[in-house]
From Swiss-Prot:
Organism of this sequence: Bacillus cereus (strain Q1)
A single GO cellular-component term on record: cytoplasm
Stated name of the protein: Probable manganese-dependent inorganic pyrophosphatase
Coiled coil keyword on record: no
Subcellular location: Cytoplasm
Residues reported to bind Mn(2+) 1: H9, D13, D75
Keywords: Cytoplasm, Hydrolase, Manganese, Metal-binding
A GO term, aspect molecular function: inorganic diphosphate phosphatase activity
Length: 309
């Protein structure tokens, strides 16, 4: 049987990795030869979840067309966030919870996108719809994805469906969602030992906003100063990325997981758009973004609107 690769976006977060594993397992149960893979490094937070539930991480690939003809995308749809040669393969399915942009296919596909906080929440429904029991380890990874995307149910992207799914999955996994979740988020917020290049690419996504090319990277921290103490070095590596990719804006967002506020570091010729979008003034290229924790709901649409205004 021909193999199908299942993967999340570049610079994968916990949902991108764990949903690839969970959906590949569901597809295998339904008779498909599916393998989860990843398009980037595994973060400390994701590694904590994999280690905790004793699951091996997916192997790394940059291109897919040399291996397979067909792929399934989870947790993304935009071409620039996907495999480098995504145009050379057929996308069979997309399971996602983000905006739909820069995406088209030549054939009809199964496309499931729901306004929930996490791809794993959708997969929880799909396991039920297909009458497949979720293994304990996989339930733990799916729970981890929801906790990560919802910042332990505090993000404005978090819905009642996400909370309900997390409680169900926690029961299957045999963990206390709140206790485990805080441990996992703290593991993800431990940025010691990371290079500046790693910090700005741990969870980075590229977007087309009007005519502007924008990259938004986000890291969680227990104290934003632990990251911003390195601002001069961060600006140097961000400026190099801006030049290399021809970006109009690179916004590096440091989110405090205890206060649920963020600090944005804006570099690029369109940095002033951040000021316009949030009605703030950049001082030394940074501004506090009160109550902003979600890239999907509080950054991407706000900046997109500002660029198109």
């Amino acid at each position: 049987m021909e193999k199908v690769l299942v993967f999340g976006h570049k610079n994968p977060d916990t949902d991108a990795i764990c949903s690839a594993i969970a959906y590949a397992e569901l597809k295998k149960e339904l008779g498909m030869n599916a393998e989860p893979v990843r398009l980037g490094e595994i973060s400390g937070e994701t590694q904590f979840a994999l280690d905790y539930f004793k699951v091996e991480g997916p192997r790394f690939v940059e291109t897919v067309a040399s291996e397979v003809d067909n792929v399934i995308l989870v947790d993304h749809n935009e071409r620039q966030q996907s495999a480098n040669d995504i145009e050379s393969v057929r996308v069979l399915e997309v399971i996602d919870h983000h905006r739909i942009a820069n995406f088209e296919t030549s054939d009809p596909i199964y496309y499931r996108c729901e306004p929930v906080g996490c791809t794993a929440t959708i997969l929880n429904k799909m396991y039920k719809e297909n009458g497949i029991t979720i293994r304990k380890e996989v339930a733990g990874l799916m729970l981890s994805a929801i906790i990560s995307d919802s910042l332990l149910f505090k993000s404005p992207t978090c819905t009642e469906q996400d909370v309900a799914a997390a409680r169900e999955l926690a029961e299957i996994a045999g963990v206390d969602a709140d206790k485990y979740g805080l441990e996992m988020l703290k593991a993800g917020a431990d940025l010691s030992g990371k290079t500046m290049e790693q910090l700005i690419s741990l969870d980075a996504k590229e977007f087309q906003m009007g005519n502007a090319k924008v990259e938004i990277a986000q890291v969680n921290a227990v104290d934003t100063n632990d990251v911003l103490v390195h601002q001069a070095e961060l600006e140097k590596v961000i400026s190099a990325v801006v030049e290399e990719k021809g970006l109009d804006l690179f916004l590096f967002v440091v989110t405090d997981i205890l206060t649920n506020d963020s600090v944005g570091l804006a570099i690029g010729k369109a940095a002033n758009v951040v000021e316009k979008a949030y009605n703030v003034s950049l001082e030394n290229n940074t501004a506090t973004l009160k109550g902003v924790v979600s890239r999907k709901k509080q950054i991407v649409p706000v900046l997109t609107e500002a660029f198109q205004a």
